[in-house]
Amino acid sequence: MARAHPGDATLPSILVSFIFLQLLTSGNGKSDFLVLGPPHPLLAIVGQDKELPCKLSLNISAEGMELRWYRDKPSSVVHVYKNGEDVYDEQMVEYKGRTSFNGSHVARGEAAVKIHNVTVFDNGTYHCVFKEYTSHSQATLWLKVAGRGSSPRIRVTDTQDKGIRAECTSAGWYPEPKVEWLDLKGQPVSAESHFSVSASTGLVALLSIVTPQDTAVGGLTCSISNPLLPEKDTGFLAAVVKVSVSGAHTGNIGQSVQSHGSIIKSSESFSVKVP
């Protein structure tokens, strides 16, 4: 009679356990999944719409899953999609009526929430969670909001004792823009700039002042740019001031504004008193 080896008795139980585990993981392919978000920050423009996309790492369906987008903490809900429909009960007041779900590719594990009419206050971190039964995974997204400000306006006045004063104003920027004054030779001109933030919109307005010397009054350029946007996208905003003070009491402001590839020209007259 052949003797049974002690280890042989455990082989059937090991085989059964292995088959059971295989059945658990291969039933619908979703028992162990990973959610991915964009690898880089997303850029959104104030007043426009922006999607926050997330997807499963494997090409498997997210149908039947609960999909949730929130801000810094789970209770700060941006949008929830559950049981095939949008759920608004938990949504933050700030996002009421401003979000929509894009599930056109949910069958292949992709979904997105669109934020409509982006504001400065949408800037920051987001999280998306895909949940099925007790399994869930989440990804983090970063949204950078940029505000394109208005074309700069230049006003020139004669301050009597301090000579000519040029003011460059603009509003609607985010974050704080960069302001640069140049003379006609392309040399920088020292300026005093002030920024203010609107409590209601979070957008930045600016007032930049120069008191040009005689060598600079032939012309000035005030340039304003957004640090988040390339020149070719935001446009280069400039206003050129030409002042004639050689014994005359009047002059012309020639204003040229270049924005998004277009040139706008206007002129107006002003009076200065020349000693």
Curated annotation (Swiss-Prot):
Residues 30-140 form the Ig-like V-type domain. The chain crosses the membrane at residues 195-211. Residues 212-275 are cytoplasmic. GO terms for cellular component: membrane. Keywords: Disulfide bond, Glycoprotein, Immunoglobulin domain, Membrane, Signal, Transmembrane, Transmembrane helix. InterPro entries: BTN3A2-like_Ig-C (IPR053896), Ig-like_dom (IPR007110), Ig-like_dom_sf (IPR036179), Ig-like_fold (IPR013783), Ig_sub (IPR003599), Ig_V-set (IPR013106), IgSF_BTN/MOG (IPR050504). Disulfide bonds join 54-128. Residues 30-194 are extracellular. Glycans are attached at residues 59, 117, 123. Belongs to the immunoglobulin superfamily. BTN/MOG family. This is Butyrophilin-like protein 10.
